[in-house]
Amino acid sequence: MKAGFWVAPEGEGAAMTVMPIGAEPPLRARKLNFLATSSAEEMIRRCRRTAMLLPELADALAVQKAEQPGRLFDITDFPDDDRELITQTLGEGEVAGVAALANGVTAQMQEAVMAGVWRIRFTDVDGRLIADYIEVASIPAAVRQACSGLPASISHGPAPAGAMNVMPVLTEIGDRIARYRDGDPAHVITFSLFPMSPEDMAFLQDALGAGPVQLTSRGYGTCRVVATGARNVWSVQFYNAMDTIILDTLEVCNIPSVAIAAEEDFRDSEARLRDIWEAYFK
């Protein structure tokens, strides 16, 4: 098993796996220069709904605030060519993930190359696509929805044999959960800074449980953000190029900032999207 906080217990699978989005072939990193090809020119002529959508997305980005709810654009009934052109135009950005919702529904999320613009595909328990949206938001609403029913407390038994620091860590987590209010700064517990035995980590995993959301951010390195079974408690692990954990933390917060689009991202993405529309769709 790989070292770090969030390791599935022996014999169990991971609670959630980052997976290719939707029932279609996996999205690949696509260069925007596709739009300059002859194939794209013909597709753009056919796909007027996409041409109409892009300025609406830019307008939404112009007024979006990081702390406000996002805006959804339903493309479920768009023709296949339009949806493919949207995929090509938006590309694949740094953050992707999945959220398990009620009734077996899964929200599969991919940020565009324009930060703060997300492609959200909802699939049923059999993997069939049931809805397809573009969302302008700091983080998709499905993430908060999936976590809304988690308990705001933790319970556990006595310390196991071989425990070193798990009990004070659990006390700290429980205290921070009880005190946390929306908008409070994140409280970070860094496991890299003090010793935790394997018994500590196993007991901590069992006490917190598995949550319904997993996100991966790929920028200069890889960061995996996993919701635990306690509200506002997240495992945040940073990996190097060898897929080795270099920083292992828990964050008590609404959603870790590493996965969230910032205020300036919306303005930058608005400008970029308008440039694309002017160059290829106008």
From Swiss-Prot:
Purpose: Not known. Could enhance the incorporation of nickel to the hydrogenase.
Q: Does the keyword Ribonucleoprotein apply?
A: no
Q: What is this protein called?
A: Hydrogenase expression/formation protein HupH
Q: Which cysteines are joined by disulfide bonds?
A: none
List the InterPro entries: HupH_C_sf, HupH_Hydgase_express_prot_C
Task: Alphabetically list the UniProt keywords.
Answer: Nickel
Gene label: hupH
Origin organism of this chain?
Rhizobium leguminosarum bv. viciae
Q: Where are the transmembrane segments?
A: none
- Superkingdom of the organism of origin: Bacteria
Q: Which family does it belong to?
A: Belongs to the HupH/HyaF family.
